[in-house]
């Protein structure tokens, strides 16, 4: 694969360039110097705050300007190739991108809260042995517009509003976000901009397998999402077996990077731990997790393995999960994530373009 495409995502040869993914600076350049500066802001707010699906819907613009823009640009949302609906209300979207590749996005309604799980890459290069996405390998990284477009499309399709504090975004779908950091940062700036999509930083989380240099880089961003770390083992040896990329990024160095990460007053680091029967789910593992995280402002999310074809591990019994949680939560906030969308392959670690 072309390395520049792998790094920054698809640019393509389309006749009309997408507006989704552009920030205010990009939009001003697209409009040209003959348009007043406030026109860019009108487009920006209409697309991200107003969720306009096409240029016709941006009624604040003069008709001639809309016509001129339409000759060169389109809003540029992905296309729904297929929608899978779970008995628990979860929806898995297979989205077709401009180059014909597909990526998956999941909506998880839960009473008064909705969560959209979005992807940062088509496939994933990290090769976690318990994750079905790893079986795809990496096809390419997504552009900022393709990342934001997932949110806009799912929000529009389900009449979700970004205000009111009920919508959460988690970048825990396909891909390793920190290996596409440039586009992830640009996308999250738009999602967190009050004039853009307008979410609070408390409502957006990016998950990483532990790409140490990029953790520090993300920490320097003035406006950034919350950070979650995929831990998944209590020893270096076990972690390297389950997550081969960690042979490059060692556990002690990861914990040091987490210690140095600048947390806001309200913030904790989240550590995610996928429990695999007989592999990393013992009481001794739980005690080692407590020791590893003892000097961090952290919480732990436990995920009992969501099974799938090609995954050589089993889900632990509920009693084993409860025992693990009870040990960890004596020292740290510890929660068990409820599986969502198991019947449509929409749960954590199951996103591999499966047809149900």
From Swiss-Prot:
Protein name: Probable dual-specificity RNA methyltransferase RlmN
BP terms from Gene Ontology: rRNA base methylation; tRNA methylation
InterPro entries: Aldolase_TIM, Methyltransferase_A, RNA_MTrfase_RlmN, rRNA_lsu_MTrfase_RlmN/Cfr, rSAM
SUPFAM superfamilies: Radical SAM enzymes (SSF102114)
Keywords for this protein: 4Fe-4S, Cytoplasm, Disulfide bond, Iron, Iron-sulfur, Metal-binding, Methyltransferase, rRNA processing, S-adenosyl-L-methionine, Transferase, tRNA processing
Highest taxon of source: Bacteria
Residues noted as binding [4Fe-4S] cluster in the record, renumbered to the chain: 124, 128, 131
Residues the entry annotates as binding S-adenosyl-L-methionine: 175-176, 207, 230-232, 306
Main location: cytoplasm
Enzyme Commission number: 2.1.1.192
Gene designation per UniProt: rlmN
Pfam annotation, one family: Radical_SAM
Cellular localisation: Cytoplasm
Species per Swiss-Prot/TrEMBL record: Solibacter usitatus (strain Ellin6076)
The family this protein is said to belong to: Belongs to the radical SAM superfamily. RlmN family.
